[in-house]
């Protein structure tokens, strides 16, 4: 669905200059396993049903003019899950990255690629690459851990506050304006701790495989009403 058509039908506010569109949206696509159980499937089956929502969200954000999206694929803690589930979400992340690489995007996969848990198929994506016409920055966190991300800070303790962002592993990812989490959980789960310091955080109770455009619309309407203080 073209988001401008959707927006025109649902809420004319988003079409005007009054709408504050976030430059960078973080996406925590939670609830895949609970969705599977609710639909009579084993827990490992739900991840595949999260692929189309990821592509749909990308298209909606691109049409709206969002400049950057970061998807939370899986964390180093997630790899402690049962092998069947782990294999399923790793495969889903590989498939998702390959699917997004067919779009117009500047794509980057970020995570601990030195670990055996990092899928080898995604190694070529650990350097940002332009696909199609490029334009929108797409970041995909794979085998990501906040401790891994910040580990360089121990070696750069003398760095000034303004230079800290250059020392972390995710230094090519911008500050996040809005984080949207599906699945109802009210926590960030270690999502980009430095870039998310002043992020607004919106939670959607529906599970990720049940994504619908209204979710994004509701998040953007809520975001538009927030005061931008940055601690001031």
Locations of the language-model features?
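Flexible, compositionally biased loop and terminal segments
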Residues: 2-232
